[in-house]
A protein has these predicted regions:
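Non-catalytic cap/lid and distal C-terminal segments of serine-dependent acyl enzymes
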Residues: 1-277
Length: 277
């Protein structure tokens, strides 16, 4: 397994941006096993962090590096700042995630070009980014994982709190994310709910969707509402609830469930940089 820290120049963001990449490339077969074909590209998960996070969050909070190696899965973890993974006046974070990042990593690493091998996931703000960009760029992504997601925009964004200790709750930041007309944002492609309705009306092919939320999570009702919308629009999906709140213990457990839900096979055992003999 190779763990890479990468910086590259992004045209969408207008600056150099960091990301962390897991590549299960150096695994040596055990005696009697056949090596993985060198020309076989890797299935890929683009994994997005939550608010105030960075491209190292998933490595620190979960066992993703071991689970990825066990499944011969490449994992790309970009730094999304506090952008909601939406295009804003200064940086096109949505296009960066949905187009530029995928194009760059496919050119740079041995990743599959196929939609059915390309997945996007995230937690909290990253879950929102995965839903929004997975749906907007549905021709690129074959599956979406949304854990404890800010699943949809609703009237809550019209009532910011200027006294909140969280900058993302303030009016200026919300207008930066969603535009000056917050009511219009509710009916735009910034809202995953609108994208669901639009794609359903068009008869488009939806990515497979996996959602999970803790039963004590403050975002539980938003997740239930989005689940109900998917049911109303007859969109196949998996929605799971379990004990826990907005915390890494829950995300670690349900990330494994999500990986088991993806069309991945457990790879043959081998020796790599993560093994100690």
């Amino acid at each position: 397994m190779a763990l890479l820290e990468v910086s590259f120049s992004s045209q969408c963001l207008g600056r150099t941006v960091p990301m962390t990449v897991i590549l299960p490339t150096d695994k040596q077969p055990m005696p009697g096993q056949q090596p993985r074909p060198r020309d076989l590209p890797y299935k890929t998960l683009y994994l997005l962090h939550g608010v105030y996070g960075s491209c190292t969050d998933w490595l620190c909070g979960t066992r993703i590096r071991w689970w990825a190696e066990a499944r011969d899965l490449a994992v790309v973890m970009p730094s999304g700042e506090n952008s909601m993974y939406l295009d804003n006046p200064a940086a096109a974070f949505g296009e960066f995630i949905g187009r530029e990042l995928v194009d760059f990593t496919r050119r740079t690493f041995p990743l599959s070009q196929k939609r059915e091998d390309t997945y996007i996931g995230g937690l909290s703000m990253g879950g929102f980014g995965a839903l929004r960009n997975g749906l907007k760029y549905h021709e690129t992504f074959g599956a979406i994982i949304a854990l404890s997601a800010v699943a949809m925009l609703d009237a809550d964004i019209l009532n910011p709190s200027e006294t909140s200790t969280l900058p993302i709750d303030r009016m200026a930041v919300r207008r930066w994310h969603y535009g000056n007309d917050l009511m219009a944002a509710l009916e735009s492609d910034r809202n995953p709910a609108c994208l669901v309705k639009k794609l359903a009306e068009e008869g488009a092919e939806f990515p497979a969707i996996y959602m999970a939320c803790g039963e004590s999570d403050f975002l539980l009702e938003k997740n239930k509402a989005f689940h109900a919308l998917l049911q109303t629009c007859h969109v196949p999906h998996t929605f799971e609830l379990g004990p826990g709140s907005h915390e890494w213990d829950f995300w670690d457990r349900y990330l494994l469930k999500a990986l088991n839900w993806l069309p991945l096979e457990i790879a043959a055992e081998g020796r790599g940089s993560g093994n100690v003999l």
